[in-house]
Amino acid sequence: MSVLTSLLLRGLTGSARRLPVPRAKIHSMPPEEELGIMEKAIALTSCFVTFLLPAGWILSHLEDYKRPE
């Protein structure tokens, strides 16, 4: 990168560095009731079935999807 390019980029980003970044004021309360073991197991199982099972199916049948040459 040339010196001129770095000076131009520094000039463009220099003013953006001085702007104040607004902070979100997020406050939350503790949960009214804790999740039980059964709810956690159902959530993990549904995530597994939703994401990992189709990916595993595609990876295990990858040879079937290839074009014959």
Curated annotation (Swiss-Prot):
Entry superkingdom: Eukaryota
Mitochondrial matrix topological segments: 26-36
Predominant subcellular localization, coarse grouping: mitochondrion
Keywords: Membrane, Mitochondrion, Mitochondrion inner membrane, Transit peptide, Transmembrane, Transmembrane helix, Ubl conjugation
Membrane topology summary: Single-pass membrane protein
Transit peptide feature range: 1-25
GO cellular component entries: mitochondrial inner membrane; respiratory chain complex IV
Post-translational modification note: In response to mitochondrial stress, the precursor protein is ubiquitinated by the SIFI complex in the cytoplasm before mitochondrial import, leading to its degradation. Within the SIFI complex, UBR4 initiates ubiquitin chain that are further elongated or branched by KCMF1.
Transmembrane segments: 37-60
Subcellular location(s) per record: Mitochondrion inner membrane
Mitochondrial intermembrane side: 61-69
Positions of short motif SIFI-degron: 2-19
Pathway: Energy metabolism; oxidative phosphorylation
Family membership noted in the UniProt record: Belongs to the cytochrome c oxidase VIII family.
Assembly and interaction partners: Component of the cytochrome c oxidase (complex IV, CIV), a multisubunit enzyme composed of 14 subunits. The complex is composed of a catalytic core of 3 subunits MT-CO1, MT-CO2 and MT-CO3, encoded in the mitochondrial DNA, and 11 supernumerary subunits COX4I, COX5A, COX5B, COX6A, COX6B, COX6C, COX7A, COX7B, COX7C, COX8 and NDUFA4, which are encoded in the nuclear genome.
Purpose: Component of the cytochrome c oxidase, the last enzyme in the mitochondrial electron transport chain which drives oxidative phosphorylation. The respiratory chain contains 3 multisubunit complexes succinate dehydrogenase (complex II, CII), ubiquinol-cytochrome c oxidoreductase (cytochrome b-c1 complex, complex III, CIII) and cytochrome c oxidase (complex IV, CIV), that cooperate to transfer electrons derived from NADH and succinate to molecular oxygen, creating an electrochemical gradient over the inner membrane that drives transmembrane transport and the ATP synthase.
Protein name: Cytochrome c oxidase subunit 8A, mitochondrial
